[in-house]
């Protein structure tokens, strides 16, 4: 049995860890509240974006009927090259949050490569970058400080290169993967085809749409510009949604760690009391033996 001093040091160490995990849980809780507020604002903006895109969809449907449709909406069932854009956290200590995304990306890579499709990776988040770099895989584009502090302009800048490669036919399809916020206790892996845009993702308005835009510029230019805004927003929202899920996962992980620490302290306290009792018993026996020897 370990001596009393060693056990006492262990108890102190575990208690310090418990204080840290409790503090991290509180910090994550506060950050989650702020991130959810951002998410609500983004969701409100999403409705407006969807209204705009619904008008676009109506125009695209008309163009599609005429047999001429832009590349951003032209579905490709057999892409030669696919870009996978994925979001992970910059930090750990959030349970299986990052690995859930990484496993999904790995599965998609295997599925596409089995079909003979070339896969290129675009990573937002240090954990994803570190994992696939360690696996020896090439990461076409990386951002290791974007997922922890989502910013619309930086999100648009990140996704810009992806969109340009798609427009220039360097890649045929863009998929986005991230672990999204479901509720305070759950996260959900989300996989979406970002490009080409599926008309099923938007509600097509009729000609009486409140956004019956009559552009002064060339209609194709307006369509491209609004499509770019839609893509930018989806990247930004993925970052916010992922960050909310990250804070939620970290709260759960820290709560579990705090609970385990408490159980460990209780276990060590019992061990300490037993060791202390054994030490006292040994001392008493030695005293009694000494007294008996003097008689």
Curated annotation (Swiss-Prot):
Task: State one molecular function term (GO).
Answer: proton-transporting ATP synthase activity, rotational mechanism
GO BP: proton motive force-driven plasma membrane ATP synthesis
Q: How does it sit in the membrane?
A: Peripheral membrane protein
Q: Which UniProt keywords apply?
A: ATP synthesis, Cell inner membrane, Cell membrane, CF(1), Hydrogen ion transport, Ion transport, Membrane, Transport
Cellular component per GO, a single term: proton-transporting ATP synthase complex
Gene3D superfamilies per the UniProt record, alphabetical: 3.40.1380.10, ATP synthase, gamma subunit, helix hairpin domain
Subcellular localization is given as: Cell inner membrane
- Similarity comment text for this entry: Belongs to the ATPase gamma chain family.
Q: What does this protein do?
A: Produces ATP from ADP in the presence of a proton gradient across the membrane. The gamma chain is believed to be important in regulating ATPase activity and the flow of protons through the CF(0) complex.
The record's subunit annotation is: F-type ATPases have 2 components, CF(1) - the catalytic core - and CF(0) - the membrane proton channel. CF(1) has five subunits: alpha(3), beta(3), gamma(1), delta(1), epsilon(1). CF(0) has three main subunits: a, b and c.
The molecule here is called: ATP synthase gamma chain
